[in-house]
């Protein structure tokens, strides 16, 4: 079923000048509008050479027209693509002519929205289109491609189906409330719930990895002045991004630099050194450093290997809330003897490069967690997906608790809420305002 009676049009090719430009139409009037442009007797899935004409019969451009008939198209509607020269002036003129003939300018993401509303793909797959377009590296692109192919959605649907079966079992038990739960297969029900919980937990871990692949991680370099934070950022970035001097307090503001770790993006944040005192500007820099820690995924505590206690005194409890930490003993080349370090510490020299390869390995492991080399089956995910999975997990845990007290009605409600949370991921249960927010972030021609 079509999502709208209107026919929409937009430039579908990338902005700017190019060899080829594409204008896309979708809706019931697409073929009629194409005919009025000068493209007669079109056949579905055949390329037609044509001259695209304005209202006075003058040629706007010439090129290829393609008709994808409903429902065998991306949107599920009649779709016509006009491929001409990649001149923004000509493409805008062609869009204007289509609007004169009855189409309207498409909203951002409206083609993908119609594909979703017409059942051509689910919401997670639609989001994967935007992720594929925006992918910053090959690994992220492949993960987005798998999400677009439905790898993520099928796993979500499998868990949702399991919860539905368990809920049916609980609802049936409610009808026999006078019977003890064990006589109604209560042990089997709890076992099934435990298995569903394990599958959901693994899916949540994989989705969190997918979110990291899509968004990257935020790693904050923190420590006392002159520990070598800026030198380390430059060494990891492979360029002189940060100013390095022997003067304590040189870094006054935060500096962000994205690096690639085997196809994974890690944003390093250089910050002002933490210490007591300092002038007003330096104190503001330290305030910003602590603010960066509040949203950090990873704290890289950089200290002078000759005086590690100074870093601990300067930092105090500033990094306690950061989930992952790595203590980096910099300037290890200045030590006469090797030092024994804890498991969450590493010795490096930003100047000589000693230990940097091992640091890359540790950063990669901290970024993606266990199984960093296992890319098979990776899919892209978003923060909202992870949040929905966490809610589902919480409701499954609550259902298990209620079953333990034989509170069947409450257990059934928790299972319903878990199922609802999963439905938000694929769009089977999504509010209109959520859909509007998601599709408005897409390109105009998608």
Curated annotation (Swiss-Prot):
Q: What is its main location?
A: cytoplasm
Question: Cofactor note, please?
Answer: Binds 1 potassium ion per subunit.
Instruction: Report the locations given in the UniProt record.
Output: Cytoplasm
Q: Where does K(+) bind?
A: 226, 245, 247, 250
Residues reported in the UniProt entry to bind (6S)-5-formyl-5,6,7,8-tetrahydrofolate: 24, 81, 120, 446
Q: Is Nucleus among the key words of this record?
A: no
Instruction: Give the EC number(s) under which this enzyme is classified.
Output: 3.6.-.-
Binding positions (Mg(2+)): 230, 251
What Pfam families does this protein map onto? MMR_HSR1, MnmE_helical, TrmE_N
GO cellular component terms given for this protein: cytosol
Sorted UniProt keywords: Cytoplasm, GTP-binding, Hydrolase, Magnesium, Metal-binding, Nucleotide-binding, Potassium, tRNA processing
Cofactor list: K(+)
Would the keyword 4Fe-4S turn up in this protein's UniProt record?
Answer: no
Look up the record and give one Gene Ontology term from the biological process aspect: tRNA methylation
For this chain, the family text in UniProt reads: Belongs to the TRAFAC class TrmE-Era-EngA-EngB-Septin-like GTPase superfamily. TrmE GTPase family.
Q: What does this protein do?
A: Exhibits a very high intrinsic GTPase hydrolysis rate. Involved in the addition of a carboxymethylaminomethyl (cmnm) group at the wobble position (U34) of certain tRNAs, forming tRNA-cmnm(5)s(2)U34.
Q: How does it assemble?
A: Homodimer. Heterotetramer of two MnmE and two MnmG subunits.
NCBIfam families (UniProt xref): mnmE_trmE_thdF (TIGR00450), PRK05291.1-3 (NF003661), small_GTP (TIGR00231)
UniProt name for this protein:
tRNA modification GTPase MnmE
Q: Which gene encodes it?
A: mnmE
């Amino acid at each position: 079923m079509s999502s709208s009676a209107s026919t929409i049009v937009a430039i579908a090719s990338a902005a700017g000048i190019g060899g080829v430009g594409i204008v896309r139409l979708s809706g019931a009037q697409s073929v009629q509008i194409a005919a009025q442009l000068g493209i007669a007797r079109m056949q579905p899935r055949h390329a037609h050479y044509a001259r695209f004409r304005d209202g006075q019969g003058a040629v706007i451009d010439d090129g290829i027209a393609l008709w994808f008939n409903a429902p065998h198209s991306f949107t599920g509607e009649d779709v016509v693509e006009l491929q001409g020269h990649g001149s923004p002036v000509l493409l805008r003129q062609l869009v204007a002519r289509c609007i004169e003939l009855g189409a309207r300018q498409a909203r951002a993401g409206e083609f993908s929205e119609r594909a979703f509303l017409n059942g051509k793909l689910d919401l997670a797959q639609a989001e994967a289109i935007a992720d594929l377009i925006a992918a910053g590296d090959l690994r992220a692109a492949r993960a987005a491609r798998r999400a677009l192919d439905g790898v993520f959605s099928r796993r979500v649907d499998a868990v949702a189906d399991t919860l539905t079966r368990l809920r049916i079992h609980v609802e049936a038990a409610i009808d026999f409330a006078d019977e003890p739960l064990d006589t109604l297969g209560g042990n089997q029900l709890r076992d099934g719930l435990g298995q569903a919980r394990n599958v959901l937990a693994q899916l949540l871990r994989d989705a969190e990895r997918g979110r990291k692949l899509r968004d990257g991680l935020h790693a904050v370099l923190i420590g006392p002045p002159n520990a070598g934070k800026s030198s380390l950022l430059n060494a990891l970035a492979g360029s002189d991004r940060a100013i390095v001097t022997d003067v304590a307090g040189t870094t006054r503001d935060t500096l962000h630099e994205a690096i690639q770790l085997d196809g994974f993006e890690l944003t390093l944040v250089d910050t002002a050194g933490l210490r007591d005192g300092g002038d007003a500007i330096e104190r503001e820099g330290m305030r910003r450093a602590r603010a960066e820690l509040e949203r950090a995924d990873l704290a890289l505590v950089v200290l002078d290997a000759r005086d590690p206690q100074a870093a601990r005194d300067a930092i105090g409890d500033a990094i306690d809330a950061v989930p992952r930490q790595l203590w980096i003993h910099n300037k290890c080349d200045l030590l006469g003897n090797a030092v024994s370090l804890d498991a969450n510490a590493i010795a490096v020299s930003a100047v000589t490069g000693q230990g940097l390869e091992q640091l890359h390995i540790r950063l990669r492991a901290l970024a993606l967690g266990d199984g960093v080399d296992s890319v098979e089956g990776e899919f892209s995910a978003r923060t909202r997906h992870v949040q929905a999975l966490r809610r589902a997990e919480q409701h499954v845990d609550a259902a298990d608790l209620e079953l333990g007290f034989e509170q069947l009605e409450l257990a059934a409600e928790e299972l319903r809420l878990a199922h609802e949370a999963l439905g938000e991921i694929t769009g089977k249960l999504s509010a209109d305002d959520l859909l509007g927010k998601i599709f408005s972030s897409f390109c105009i021609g998608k």
